[in-house]
Curated annotation (Swiss-Prot):
Gene for this chain: SHE2
Major subcellular site: cytoplasm
Keyword hit for Transit peptide: no
Alphabetical UniProt keywords: Cytoplasm, mRNA transport, Nucleus, RNA-binding, Transport
Family (UniProt): Belongs to the SHE2 family.
Pfam entry (one): She2p
Gene Ontology molecular function: any one: RNA binding
Keyword field contains RNA-binding: yes
Function text: RNA-binding protein that binds specific mRNAs including the ASH1 mRNA, coding for a repressor of the HO endonuclease. Part of the mRNA localization machinery that restricts accumulation of certain proteins to the bud and in the daughter cell.
Assembly notes: Homodimer and homotetramer.
One Gene Ontology biological process: mRNA transport
Upper taxonomic lineage: Eukaryota, Fungi, Dikarya, Ascomycota, Saccharomycotina
Protein name: SWI5-dependent HO expression protein 2
Length: 240
């Protein structure tokens, strides 16, 4: 709670700052997708047979922009106390929004890295118009960590009801149980248990560490996206 600060109000401002950092990193993550999808849509405009896929991706871009605008317009309240109950209410509210976004993102990632990839090969016979394997790996790794962070930010504060579950984590646990996987020895990030924090000071410290990790993952993903754009551009220029 307030043991790391003599003034409770200062502690509350710090909590608000932490929430703003989390909000910013999610916004950056969403913006990265909007940017690369717009680039990819521009490339697909040159391929008449990919009209349906292009239209679907445009719909996803609109959804992503909606999520981002909603997030950016949201103002975190200035907490009047560092009471854990008050913080839980705030975390549950923003966590629920993140879960809604991530469930859609899961479908988008599948569509982008599986369905569209197959259609590109089938309709153009040009594999260089696809996302490179390195970019797909970054997409998956970044998504997995954003999912795990969202689970952590809620469950570390003992927010763990039926409406706060994330499908990909629940499915991973179900499969692990059926396969008799030792959950204490697994390297699967979705199967790793979330330990509750002992104080809000610890929660804030770990949140900042998480934000740093997520920022690094976004930077790595954006680097692969830039390389993908170069590949697509070169592939389409050769056809002129």
């Amino acid at each position: 709670m307030a043991e790391t600060a003599n003034n409770g109000e200062l502690q509350n401002v710090t909590l608000k700052d932490i929430f703003e950092q989390i909000k910013e990193v999610f916004s950056t993550y969403i913006s990265s997708y909007v940017h690369i999808l717009n680039k990819f849509i521009g490339i697909l405009r040159k391929v008449s047979t990919m009209r349906f896929e292009r239209s679907t991706l445009i719909k996803y871009v609109k959804k992503l922009r909606f999520f981002n605008e909603t997030l950016l317009n949201y103002e975190f309240p200035l907490l009047t106390s560092s009471d854990i109950t008050t913080v839980r209410l705030q975390v549950k509210a923003i966590g629920s929004f993140f879960i809604k976004f991530l469930e859609m993102q899961d479908i988008l990632n599948y569509y982008l890295t599986q369905s569209v990839q197959n259609e590109v090969i089938s309709k153009t016979l040009n594999y260089k118009l696809n996302f490179p394997d390195a970019a797909i790996e970054r997409i998956e790794d970044s998504y997995n960590h954003f999912v795990k962070f969202t689970q952590w930010m809620m469950q570390s504060l003992l927010i763990d009801d039926e409406l706060s579950q994330i499908e990909v984590i629940q499915f991973s646990i179900k499969c692990a149980v059926e396969d008799n996987v030792d959950l204490t020895q697994t390297t699967n990030i979705f199967l790793q248990e979330v330990a509750p924090v002992e104080s809000l000071a610890e929660y804030m410290e770990l949140s900042e560490e998480w934000v740093a990790i997520l920022k690094d993952l976004i930077a790595r993903m954006e680097n692969e996206f830039s390389l993908a754009v170069v590949q697509w551009t070169e592939a389409t220029e050769k056809k002129k």
